[in-house]
């Protein structure tokens, strides 16, 4: 099998596929409150295009798929998309990232269609604050979605918490306490300068050392744990005696580019080899031409930078490549 390898020796076996740029929420770090123009439906990859693309990609070593958005559960055919991917025997793992507003209703059907596990965005455990950060989200719906995911066996369940200075950094110990009784992995993620002009994002940025400081202040003893299924770049720990775990993902202060194994496919059909760079290539004209399609994918991988230099934005230093100005919802979170 010819593997998708870049010039730095990184083998790519994982792809994140955005199935929509639309979302029912407007999280402060992801989307503006208003003024967004969404893709017309005919510009969004169809189920058949996604499945056809993946039937080819598995021949080159891709074996893990994460479905993203926008909010992927807004797709009326999301169960059929999962079922189509699940019918490809080479795919070992199908996961989804969701805000969980509709997860309680759809978890069982998704599990039956072949979904393996789920990542859920949850940035506050206080209903009013959660509503403010998401601009309209209902915390109870997320909690119901988590419970349903547990019931149907979507495991491991991971909760993504974007740490936002002045908004949820006083809830760190609450999230850590959440792991004591539930076999859940809570992942604290640095606030990233994706699609944000200027330096205003720095006002909300906190280094993830804050997590360990909170542990120490609360008297929580913690220890490293082995890799969690599908853990990617997360460094994982367990508070002694807890059922669940917590992890930290620091794309800004300590990037993990040297072990990056992923590609991204946007909802409108552009392949991106690096989240943070503008370069992207349109696959749609070549869906029915396997040779040209794989040449395009390999070209994207060949052009992948050694690292994204995102940390330079912390020091206002010049970057050698042009960062992306698509928002996360437009790329695929």
Curated annotation (Swiss-Prot):
Keyword Secreted recorded: no
EC number: 4.1.99.22
Catalysed reactions, semicolon-separated: GTP + AH2 + S-adenosyl-L-methionine = (8S)-3',8-cyclo-7,8-dihydroguanosine 5'-triphosphate + 5'-deoxyadenosine + L-methionine + A + H(+)
A Pfam match: Radical_SAM
Coiled coil: none
Names of the cofactor(s): [4Fe-4S] cluster
PROSITE patterns listed in its UniProt record: MOAA_NIFB_PQQE, RADICAL_SAM
Binding-site positions, S-adenosyl-L-methionine: 29, 70, 121, 192
Binding-site list for GTP: 16, 66, 97, 158, 262-264
Pathway(s) annotated for this protein in UniProt: Cofactor biosynthesis; molybdopterin biosynthesis
Cofactor note: Binds 2 [4Fe-4S] clusters. Binds 1 [4Fe-4S] cluster coordinated with 3 cysteines and an exchangeable S-adenosyl-L-methionine and 1 [4Fe-4S] cluster coordinated with 3 cysteines and the GTP-derived substrate.
A Gene Ontology molecular function term of the record: S-adenosyl-L-methionine binding
Keywords, sorted A to Z: 4Fe-4S, GTP-binding, Iron, Iron-sulfur, Lyase, Metal-binding, Molybdenum cofactor biosynthesis, Nucleotide-binding, S-adenosyl-L-methionine
Domain Radical SAM core: 7-221
Function comment: Catalyzes the cyclization of GTP to (8S)-3',8-cyclo-7,8-dihydroguanosine 5'-triphosphate.
Subunit text: Monomer and homodimer.
NCBIfam families with a match to the protein in the record: moaA, PRK00164.2-1
Name this polypeptide is given: GTP 3',8-cyclase
Organism: Listeria monocytogenes serotype 4b (strain CLIP80459)
Gene (name only): moaA
């Amino acid at each position: 099998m010819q593997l998708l390898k870049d010039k730095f020796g990184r083998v790519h076996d994982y792809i994140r596929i955005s199935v929509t740029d639309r979302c029912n929420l407007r999280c402060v770090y992801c989307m503006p409150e208003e003024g967004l123009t969404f893709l017309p439906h005919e510009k969004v990859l169809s189920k058949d295009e996604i499945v056809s693309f993946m039937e080819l990609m598995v021949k080159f070593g891709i074996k893990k798929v994460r479905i993203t958005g926008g909010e992927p559960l807004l797709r009326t055919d999301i169960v059929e998309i999962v079922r189509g991917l699940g019918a490809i025997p080479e795919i070992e793992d199908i996961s989804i990232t969701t805000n969980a507003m509709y997860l309680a209703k759809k978890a069982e059907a998704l599990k039956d269609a072949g979904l393996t596990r789920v990542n859920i965005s949850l940035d506050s455990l206080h209903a009013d604050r959660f509503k403010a950060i998401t601009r309209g989200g209902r915390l109870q719906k997320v909690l119901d979605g988590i419970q349903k995911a547990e019931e149907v066996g979507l495991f491991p369940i991971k909760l993504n918490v974007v740490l936002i200075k002045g908004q949820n950094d006083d809830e760190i110990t609450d999230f850590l306490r959440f792991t004591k009784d539930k076999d859940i992995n809570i992942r604290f993620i640095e606030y990233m300068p994706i699609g944000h002009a200027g330096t205003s994002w720095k006002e909300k940025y906190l280094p993830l050392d804050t997590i360990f400081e909170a542990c120490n202040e609360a008297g929580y003893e913690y220890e490293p744990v082995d890799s969690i299924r599908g853990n990617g770049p997360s460094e994982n720990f367990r508070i002694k005696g807890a059922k669940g775990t917590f992890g930290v993902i620091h794309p800004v202060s300590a990037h993990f580019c040297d072990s990056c194994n992923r590609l991204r496919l946007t909802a409108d059909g552009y392949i991106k080899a690096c989240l943070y760079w503008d370069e992207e290539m349109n696959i749609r004209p070549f869906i029915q031409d396997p040779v040209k399609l794989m040449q395009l994918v390999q070209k994207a991988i060949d052009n992948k930078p050694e690292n994204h230099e995102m940390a330079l934005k912390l020091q206002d230093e010049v970057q050698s490549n042009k960062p992306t100005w698509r928002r996360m919802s437009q790329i695929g979170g």
